[in-house]
């Protein structure tokens, strides 16, 4: 009996233990499930936090990159301006040599305008008073039909003796130089556009380079002609615009006359002043005309370093040749000039 009782008691204990273990296992499983769920939620929150942090970091990096790009551009602009100033300073070193040659610093300025730019014309002309080297004359060529529209501010400049207004045939941009060539051929002529402010030493540097290269056209800005492997002139759109990798004098540099260009006497072929030929082959593409007529004369072109920055007068860019389809006209007239005169590099 004692053995049977002991056996029954042991059986009850085992059942109780088993029941307790099952209950414990269920409790453990429940706790593990909760921990797993909690860890999953924490993982999701961590991923969301990391994603948000990544976006914020990306935004900060983008802003930093943008700021750096701005800083780099500012530094680049400062270095470019410094390089221009250095080039101009270097040219002044030639002054003692030139002065020793008893130079004649006389020259004339030629400029044209049209009614859309008349309001700013007096500003452009008055600004020339700051030039270190002053011209013998500033000739302003205006189409006969436009004279009546000239504002009083321009007429007052003529009354003061500072400029001389000349009426001429309406040749578009060709008025910049064609009438001046017919007017005199003894002094260098500097051409400028009517919509720009210029560095106050532009005329001085043009004349310095004129004495260093007396037979060359001196231009503050140039385009470089491009040719194919066979030597044919490529379309104007493929030329190297605002070329600054060399100075010349060279056959393949075309002066852009509005930024400040000095034409020595006899630098252009006699046909340059022929209004009929200009109108036929190069109307409103005057720079191409001067270039071809220079090359026909055997004249080379030199780029003036350090003075190629364009500083436009406010409100002058609303109307201009480039806004009126002059891009296409360059292509058309280049083909006409090549057909008429041939490759200018080969002259």
Model feature map: region roles:
Residues 60-127:
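N-proximal low-complexity "stem/linker" segments adjacent to membrane-targeting elements
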Residues 187-195:
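Short beta-strand-to-loop acidic/aromatic patch adjacent to the donor-nucleotide binding site
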Residues 199, 204-275:
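Conserved catalytic core of nucleotide-sugar-dependent glycosyltransferases
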Residues 277-347:
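C-terminal catalytic/acceptor-binding lobe
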């Amino acid at each position: 009996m004692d053995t049977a009782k002991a056996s029954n008691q042991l059986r009850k204990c085992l059942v109780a233990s088993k029941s307790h273990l099952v209950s414990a296992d269920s409790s453990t499983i429940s706790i593990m499930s909760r921990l797993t769920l909690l860890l999953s939620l924490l993982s999701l929150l961590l991923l969301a936090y990391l994603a948000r942090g990544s976006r914020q970091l990306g935004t900060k990096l983008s802003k930093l990159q943008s700021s750096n790009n701005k800083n780099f551009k500012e530094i680049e602009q400062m270095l470019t301006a410094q390089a221009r100033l250095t080039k101009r300073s270097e040219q002044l070193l030639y002054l003692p040599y030139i002065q020793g040659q008893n130079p004649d610093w006389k020259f004339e300025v030629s400029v044209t305008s049209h009614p859309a730019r008349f309001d700013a014309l007096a500003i452009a002309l008055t600004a020339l008073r700051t030039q270190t080297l002053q011209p013998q004359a500033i000739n302003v060529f205006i189409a006969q039909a436009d004279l009546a529209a000239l504002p009083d501010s321009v007429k007052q400049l003529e009354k003061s003796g500072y400029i001389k207004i000349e009426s001429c045939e309406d040749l578009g941009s060709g008025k910049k130089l064609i009438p001046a060539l017919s007017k005199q051929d003894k002094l260098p002529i500097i051409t400028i556009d009517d919509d720009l402010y210029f560095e106050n030493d532009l005329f001085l540097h043009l004349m310095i380079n004129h004495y260093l290269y007396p037979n060359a056209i001196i231009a503050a800005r140039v385009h470089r002609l491009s040719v194919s492997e066979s030597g044919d002139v490529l379309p104007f759109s493929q030329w190297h615009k605002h070329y600054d990798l060399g100075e010349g004098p060279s056959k393949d540099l075309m002066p852009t006359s509005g930024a400040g260009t000095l034409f020595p006497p006899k630098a252009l072929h006699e046909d340059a002043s022929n209004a009929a030929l200009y109108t036929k082959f190069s109307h409103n593409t005057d720079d191409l005309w001067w270039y071809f007529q220079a090359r026909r004369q055997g004249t080379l072109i030199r780029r003036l370093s350090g003075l190629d920055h364009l500083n436009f007068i406010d409100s002058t860019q609303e109307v201009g040749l480039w806004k009126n389809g002059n891009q296409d006209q360059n292509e058309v007239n280049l083909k006409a000039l090549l057909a008429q005169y041939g490759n200018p590099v080969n002259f």
